[in-house]
Amino acid sequence: PLLHLQKSALSRVKDWDRRVHLTPRVIQELEWWQSELQQWNGKSVIPQKHQHILTTDASGLGWGGWWHKVGSRQRKEDEARGFFSRRESKNSSNWRELTAVSLTLRAAAPHLRNQVLLIETDNLVTKAYINHLGGRKPVLSAIARDIWSTAHQFGIQPIAVHRPGKLNQRADKLSRWKQDSTDLQLRPDLFKKADRRWGPHSIDLFANRLNRQTRRYCSWRPDPHSVASDSLLFPLTGENA
């Protein structure tokens, strides 16, 4: 991404010896690299043999993905899926595919600490943006940085590869999942009335990233932003649910 920004600046001044003013976007990019390089200091830049695989896909409806340890049995609980909002669904297919990786990785990361992770995607642009830590389009580069930031937070080393669409059926099915009872929501106006009478409520026990009614929430399956999955096992001491 910095190389693309450099080329863009040089195309305007057409002189390698002239000073170039750093734009806010360039400064933001440099600050991100400074932070991330400190986290990766001393770690190998050569891809190591992966121990886990994470496979994702996206559709116009939603996103989905699953993960497993190499050579182990695939478990249904090791998968995540969700819907795109109406606004999100209008973005390009490349945006949706990269976002599918970002959201699935956030959901899976607590289970994949300190692992070399092979990320399988049927979108070549997604593969390139992850492996190159960005590209020409700022909006896609921002998602790629988010993927790497999540990976660094949990000590994960990601490597993206292309998986042909015809071999990506499980993730594709997850991305096209229709709503079920776990995706239902209490009418917001009724929740507000209940919150005024018995609140404030500290957590929504049955929600996802789009229909949550409190900042903190539990989801039925692994979710990129939930504090826990399976609310029946969540300790409620000190909570007002």
Predicted regions and their residues:
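C-terminal reverse transcriptase regions that engage the nucleic-acid substrate
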Residues: 1-45, 165
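RNase H catalytic domain
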Residues: 105-173
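Two-metal-ion RNase H-like nuclease active-site motif
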Residues: 47-61, 204-209
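Short secondary-structure boundary/capping segments
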Residues: 132-139, 174-184, 220-222
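Short, basic/hydrophobic alpha-helical segments
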Residues: 99-118, 226-237
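C-terminal functional segments of enzyme domains
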Residues: 155-198
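Adenosine-cofactor binding site in Rossmann-like domains, unifying the SAM/SAH pocket
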Residues: 44, 84, 178, 195-240
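A short, polar/acidic, helix/strand-boundary loop motif
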Residues: 70-99, 107, 124-139
